């Protein structure tokens, strides 16, 4: 009975971010759809507490005999430490440097930011990710990417023999289910949020473009609404309070929440007048999909992956253009008929993105490449 081992190290990261969310959601769906002849287990590096990496109905996590830094260095140097299992899935580029005979390896590459926008990462982070992605396309059986945009960029910046498969993300059930408006209001009230606001969701770091959004919200033609920012602090000196003061956005119009759970995020999204996604670079943009699923209008930049995911259901603005972003947000908030049409289209489009579909596609790939590895 073959075993699929999934590396869940990202769940133990100080800031799991979107890749951590992807790991947990995908694993949960894969556990529910495991082929009868397969089993699934998880593996991490050594940590004091492995509890954050526990996924219901999946064995593990089993800790490899190295801390994260040691495991990363070992694989970076090309040492062939196989994490166990007959097939391995790496939900991030942290992956074994080569495939054992009779085994198979699939790696998810979420974006090409290290190649296209290295300045938005630390120097070491950009270099490590570039090398890890190049290893994956050279040595893994397949590389999974979330959008056609990333597939095209990957081919341009890191071509290799690995099969590149596009498998989109999904929308969690908490964003699909109906939530009583009174309950949503109660939840946002407990968080001391205003009744109406423009929302941004994501890790607070340079590539998210929050500096442009703060500047846009301070423009005289922007909607006269508060700005709510949800998400953990990442790397980089992105101080939202200082940015607000610099651009003339009154302190009372900025609300920074930090990380929230999915139940509260669902309520926050539902109560928002608009979701603003001012990113400089993205591989998918899960908040866009989640906003579409709850019926909240979206304004996003012209990053190819965001344009692809939104599919014409959001308003698109040029990256880095605060004036255009302010105007688009005003249009979404003020133009009820056009906004209602975009929201209706967004609801239909979001329904096509499910974690069950993503899990089915991943299982198809794993079974295919494991069978190929054992047919030689």
Residue ranges with predicted function:
Residues 1-376:
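Carbohydrate transferase catalytic cores enriched for Leloir-type hexosyltransferases
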């Amino acid at each position: 009975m073959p075993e699929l081992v999934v590396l869940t190290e990202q769940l133990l990261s100080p800031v799991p971010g979107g890749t951590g969310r992807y790991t947990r959601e995908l694993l949960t769906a894969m556990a529910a759809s495991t082929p009868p002849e397969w089993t699934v287990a998880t593996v991490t590096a050594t940590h004091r507490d492995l509890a954050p990496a526990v996924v219901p109905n999946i064995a593990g996590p089993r800790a490899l005999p190295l801390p994260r830094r040691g495991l990363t260095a070992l694989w970076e140097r090309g040492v062939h430490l196989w994490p166990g299992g007959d097939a391995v899935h790496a939900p991030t580029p942290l992956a074994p440097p080569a495939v054992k005979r009779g085994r198979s390896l699939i790696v998810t590459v979420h974006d090409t930011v290290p190649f296209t926008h290295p300045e938005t990462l630390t120097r070491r982070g950009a270099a490590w990710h570039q090398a890890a992605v190049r290893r994956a396309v050279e040595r893994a059986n397949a590389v999974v990417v979330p959008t056609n945009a990333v597939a095209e960029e990957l081919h341009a910046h890191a071509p290799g023999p690995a099969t590149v498969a596009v498998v989109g993300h999904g929308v969690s059930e908490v964003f699909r289910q109906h939530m009583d408006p009174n309950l949503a209001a109660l939840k946002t009230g407990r968080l001391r949020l205003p009744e109406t606001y423009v929302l941004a969701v994501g890790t607070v770091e340079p590539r998210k473009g929050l500096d442009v959004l703060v500047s846009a919200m301070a423009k005289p033609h922007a909607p006269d609404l508060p700005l709510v920012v949800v998400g953990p602090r990442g790397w980089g000196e992105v101080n939202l309070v200082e940015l607000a003061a610099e651009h003339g956005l009154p302190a009372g119009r900025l609300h920074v929440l930090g990380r929230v759970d999915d139940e509260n995020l669902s309520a926050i999204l539902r109560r928002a007048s608009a979701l603003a996604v001012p990113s400089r670079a993205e591989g998918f943009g899960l908040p866009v999909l989640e906003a579409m699923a709850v019926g909240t209008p979206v304004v996003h930049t012209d990053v190819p992956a965001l344009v692809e995911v939104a599919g014409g259901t959001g308003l698109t603005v040029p990256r880095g253009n605060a004036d255009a972003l302010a105007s688009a947000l005003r249009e979404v908030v003020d133009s009820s008929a056009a906004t209602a049409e975009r929201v209706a289209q967004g609801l239909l489009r979001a329904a096509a993105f499910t974690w069950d579909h993503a899990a089915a596609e991943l299982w198809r790939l794993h079974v295919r490449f494991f069978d190929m590895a054992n047919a030689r």
